[in-house]
Amino acid sequence: MTRQEERVRRAQQTPIVGGLPDVPGIGAAMRLTPNLGLHLRGLADELLVHDFPGATITRGERELLATAVSAGNDCFFCMDSHAAHAAAVLEHDGRHVPHAQLDSLELGGSEGFDPKMAALLHISRTVRRSALQLTADDVEAAIAAGASNGDIQLAVLIAAGFSMYNRMVDGLRARTAPSPDAYRQRAAEIAVQGYSAPAGSSAPPTSSPPTARTEPAGASRG
C-alpha cells in the first residue's frame, strides 16, 4: 500500500472513541476542554515559533523536525500538517523545501540537509524511538556540525512533544485529511500568526515577503 493509499484509508476510518468534536486531527483533542486547547497550542508555539534561548535553527527547520518525528510515529495528520507548516513558514521567509528533500525526510532520510540539520534530525529521531538511546556521542557530533546547546535541547523537546501530539491524534483516531493539500490554508495562517491564533484569523502581512531564494531549508552547502 502506498503512502497516499494509506492516507485515504485513514481518512475513511470511523473514530473508535466516542464524544469527539467533529474536527480533524489534534483539533479534536484541543476542543475537549478550553484549557487543554490553550495549553496544547501554547506548547506548539514554545517549541516551534517563539524564541528559544541559545537556539540558531529557524522556525522552518523546527517544523521539519516535527515533520520527521511525526513521520517516524506514522501519524499522517501531524506529518502532513507540519510539512505544510514548514513549507509555508519557509515560503514566507523567501525559502523553500524541494519535494525530493521532503520525501526523504518523511521516509526517515536526511538527504539534502546540511550536517547540522542532519545531526539534529538524528537526535530527534533517536529520542522518538527511545530517549535513553541518545548518547553523548550523538550530542558531540551535533555540536561538531555547528549545533548549539539550544538547538539540541529543541531537537529533544520537539521529539518528545510531538510524540505526545501524535499519540493524541492516533489514539483518539481523530479524522485525517485524504490529501496534504487540505492543510495549506491553516499553514499560511500559522506562518503569519503562530499556533495560538484561531483558525481563519490570519490577516495579510503588512509587507510583501522577500523574493524566494532557491536555497532549500537546511540544505547542504558542500
Please give the residue ranges for each predicted region.
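Hydrophobic alpha-helical segments
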Residues: 1-222
